[in-house]
Curated annotation (Swiss-Prot):
Span of domain Fe2OG dioxygenase: 74-172
Name recorded for this polypeptide: PKHD-type hydroxylase Sala_1910
GO function terms (MF aspect): 2-oxoglutarate-dependent dioxygenase activity; iron ion binding; L-ascorbic acid binding
Keywords per UniProt: Dioxygenase, Iron, Metal-binding, Oxidoreductase, Vitamin C
Organism annotation: Sphingopyxis alaskensis (strain DSM 13593 / LMG 18877 / RB2256)
Ligand binding (2-oxoglutarate): 163
Protein's UniProt keywords contain Chloroplast: no
Coiled-coil regions, chain positions: none
Length: 218
């Protein structure tokens, strides 16, 4: 299960593009030196990283769709990455844990935030294998795709222009993907239909929601 989220407005997208334009990028293997499939660039500028990650983190925690889909306990500071012609990121799952200054983060949910206009580059689609479905995403600036970190995915080769995105990983309060999906579905039903229910039945539904969260939260 995945979700597309309108995460950023035009002003935030412009601010992130400006940060990227003046920031220093290095070989993406600096953070994954043993990868045989990673071929991109990533921001390597402490001040720019701090500014860009704050913009993105603020947007995430203020976005109800993002929060209600991922149930975040911790969010890794988002990182700007760039692809120019010839670059790609071959098929891979995300690592189970990533190191952070305050300790390892378990990667339950992955997120890519698109910052380039799709018309400004060719290729570069995010290809995600979800079950038997092969899905490709090349979204408008400011849109985020959120999906389970264990899924196989790749960035197809860029053949023209520049693909600028931000990526991050989420440790979820509900690490089991099936339980997380069920909780999200139940919450959506409650939000959509709760106002039409008899008060007593809505109270019972809330009790089920709360008890499942108690059972599944880690």
């Amino acid at each position: 299960m995945f979700k597309l989220v309108q995460l950023l407005g035009d002003n935030a997208v412009r601010a992130l593009r400006d940060i990227a334009a003046s920031g220093t990028f290095v070989d993406g293997k600096i953070s994954n030196p043993h990868s045989r499939v990673k071929n991109n660039l990533q921001l390597h500028d402490a001040a720019a990283y701090e500014r860009s990650s704050k913009i993105l983190l603020d947007a995430m925690i203020q976005n109800a769709d993002f929060m209600e889909f991922s149930f975040p306990a911790r969010i890794a500071p988002p990182l700007l990455t760039r692809y120019t012609p010839g670059m790609h990121y071959g098929l891979h799952p995300d690592a189970a844990y990533i190191p952070l200054p305050d300790g390892q983060l378990r990667t339950d949910v992955s997120c890519t935030i698109f910052l380039s206009d799709p018309a400004d580059y060719d290729g570069g689609a995010l290809h995600v294998q979800l079950g038997n479905a092969d899905l490709r995403f090349k979204e408008a600036p400011g849109v985020a795709i959120v999906y389970p970190s264990h899924t196989l995915h790749e960035v197809e080769p860029v053949t023209r222009g520049e693909r600028l995105v931000a990526i991050t990983f989420i440790q979820s309060l509900i690490p089991d993907v099936q339980q997380r999906n069920l909780m999200h579905e139940l919450n959506e039903i409650a939000a959509l239909e709760g106002g039409k229910m008899e008060p007593a039945n809505y109270t019972r539904l809330q009790a089920v929601q709360y008890q499942l969260l108690r059972m599944w939260r880690r």
